Amino acid sequence: MEESAGTPFHDPKYFVSPFILNTDEGRYLVLKAIKLCNVRTIDCMKQETSCVLKVDKPQSPCPISSSDSAPKCYMQQTSPQQQRQAPQLRFINTGALSNLFANTTDKAARVINQ
């Protein structure tokens, strides 16, 4: 049975074909969606609402550009002082880790076999 990230292709509740969703904020590429069945929709009339909870939209590191031709991502630049203060996490090469594990395993096997 073919599956796409845990959702079967034959199940009518899932859309596995990508599509574009146009909104006021921009265009979104939807890779997977779930079809809603028998879910109640409540329309909100602004004149009749008594209390609305306002939630500020989080700022994206990539601002939405006005032109749709070539969207570019502008990451926030940090000053050299901020870069020096931030600790850098160093990663060990996975090849070095596997060699270390293999050497330790070999040494342990030799000790046990003696």
Swiss-Prot record:
Q: Which residues carry this modification: Phosphoserine?
A: 60, 69
Question: What GO molecular functions are on record for this protein?
Answer: DNA binding
Recorded coiled-coil stretches: none
Q: Which GO terms describe its cellular component?
A: virion component
Keyword DNA-binding annotated: yes
Q: Where in the cell is it found?
A: Virion
Region (Disordered) spans which residues?
Answer: 58-86
Concerning PTM, the database record says: Phosphorylated on two serines.
Q: Where is the composition biased (Low complexity)?
A: 76-86
InterPro entries noted in UniProt: Phosphoprotein_F17 (IPR006854)
Q: Which UniProt keywords apply?
A: DNA-binding, Host-virus interaction, Inhibition of host innate immune response by virus, Late protein, Phosphoprotein, Viral immunoevasion, Virion
Which family does the record assign?
Belongs to the orthopoxvirus OPG062 family.
Q: What quaternary arrangement does the UniProt entry report? A: Self-associates to form high molecular-weight forms. Interacts with protein OPG157. Interacts with host RICTOR and RPTOR; these interactions disrupt the mTORC1 and mTORC2 crosstalk.
Q: What is this protein called?
A: Phosphoprotein OPG062
Organism the protein comes from: Fowlpox virus (strain NVSL) (FPV)
